Amino acid sequence: MIELHPEKKMPLYEQLYNALAQDIRSGALQPGKALPGRRTMAAQLGISTNTVDTAYQMLAAEGLAVTRPRSGFFVQETGGMLHTRPQHSVVPAPKATPKNTVSNQDDILYDLSTGSIDTSLFPARSWGRIQKELMYQRPELLQRGDMQGDENLRAQIAAYLGEYRGVDCTADQVVVGAGVEYLLGCLAHLFAGSTAAVENPGYSRTRAVLENNGIPCVPVEIDESGLPIRALEQSGANLCYVTPSHHFPTGVTMPAPRRAQLLAWAAAKPGRFILEDDYDSEFRFATRPLPSLQGMSGANGPVVYLTTFSKSLAPGIRIACMVLPQGLLERYQSDFSMYANTVSRYEQQTLCEFMANGYFARHIARMRLTYKRRMEAFAAALHAGLDPDLTLAGAHSGLHFLLTLPGAGGEQAMVQAAAKQGVRLKGLSEYYMQDAAHCRPDTVVAGYSGLQAEDIPAAAAALGRAWRQMSHSVI
């Protein structure tokens, strides 16, 4: 029996989605079983049909359910899934246990982790309308598609990346996949025998994916301009994974001179490549982002460009892409010729239509303005409610910033005190892969993309209470 709780912060459609997803994964809802009609489900739970429809669309986006014309939604038939990952290139990363988090999900009132989003901003109406039209009008999408992703979507992505990020590519060079982690697994196969330099601090999941697929990683500590070239040379690596437009998690932007040095490093020896993850590049509030490294190096330069739609749309819509230079593209097409693409063709075509009709560009513009206002409101509320010596870094771009509280008694104390007030965040040291000696001791990473505007004052007040409690305990 599904129970929804209107008093909770989580939207009703997300509660319904979570309940149904759990039943599907546990086997309580068997493959092939019809889900209740929207009107029936809405009447049973006392909610609107739009709420039910949004939850069902999310299940379809996750591959847990499918729609059948004039029949409704059904639990996905496990045996009928065509899209599989190459077994030799992707191994699930080990499940890490967060060091400073609250174990009970219900205790969290304000999620300041970097992976959360405000689901109310998702363009459910236009996305759902396109998807519904495709379900009825494009039955050929049930057939197996191009291994790199449907060509018309790749053309839309190539045009968008060229206009907004200066990426120099054709649709033929674009490979669509179910998340950057999956694409990194493919690259690990192509770069077998290599060693990768990765940013420290940095995105630990990247290191896990590469190492799980046989690519040893060497952490290189960043400076105020990003990854230092001298340290990169000393690492002995022939691959370099970087987030130059918005380093995760510090927010540092790699300046043009350092970018030129990095490209020179890659060009100096055959077999060197840069893996450019254009993380959070859509959300820059003060100035336009610098062009991508890939655009600076050219279509066949030593750069693989990666990006995802997880922040611009939603993490549950598993669509990412990479742009390969010609030599690597030919190897990819040869080595992965027997594998199907990992993204549902309905999802691919929904995104294609969403981009082609201008919805995506307008959505990004609205998101950028919305998040800019929330960033400014959150920063102002934090400054008003916390210590006058509070400093924020990295707020000019991306959807999180570094929050430094001098004299707080250490980041773990801050994380634990915040958790007691119902706030989830992480300490900066959690993003270090080794040698966190240079990590600022009183610094946490605060994401605001999951905060709704009306929750900002209360979230800042909760952190204020946590800060005052720590001040008293230190004294």
Model-assigned labels for residue ranges:
Residues 131, 138-271, 282, 288-299, ...:
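Conserved core of the PLP fold type I
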Residues 1-132, 139-142, 327-328, 333, ...:
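N-terminal basic, amphipathic alpha-helical segments
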Residues 277-278:
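Walker B catalytic acidic pair
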Residues 70, 296-331:
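Active-site PLP attachment segment
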Residues 117, 245-247, 311:
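Short glycine-rich anion-binding loops that position phosphate/pyrophosphate groups of nucleotides
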Residues 273, 304, 443-445:
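Structural preference for beta-strand elements that scaffold enzyme active sites
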